[in-house]
Amino acid sequence: YHPSRDMWDTFWVNDKVVLRTHTSPGQIWAMREYFPEPIRVILPGKCYRYEQITPRSEHQFYQVEGLTIGKNIRLTDLIGVMGEFARKMYGIERKIRIRGSYFPFTEPSIEIDMSCSCENKGCRLCKSTGWLEVAGAGMVHPVVLSNGGYDPEEWTGFAFGMGVERPALLKHNIDDIRYFYN
């Protein structure tokens, strides 16, 4: 059982089968496969969530999980990786914003927003805020590290889960995620 698998955002096929809501459970598989080595992996997968369908969210999406485990990995390393992703993907004009959040598998947890293609003029994609959330992230929770075989007194790490559709929307100035699936 994964701590974020709750009834309100999950598609249950039957009482024993659930569709994947995110790629985070892949962290444990990666840790158990690569222990005791440091890890830097990307884990892609298709995900499903019981969500309202809007210009910015769909019930199905592809997610990329990033996981780094090593000695002295810090939150600033995660923020640097996300900033570098934004610069490489969009150029130096794209801004990122970090907000505190909560996820049961990271501590502390953050959400990463990127400045919208509307250039703060307001649009339906960003709900006229000028920002679009693109990733949930944080430092890997000590319990998750332990479950993966890593001693949290020695090892630290960060993880992020990023859908591929929202960055594509920003890259190509598309104003509705539903164009990908409908």
Where are these regions (language model features)?
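TRNA-recognition modules of translation machinery and tRNA-sensing kinases, especially anticodon-binding
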Residues: Y1-N182
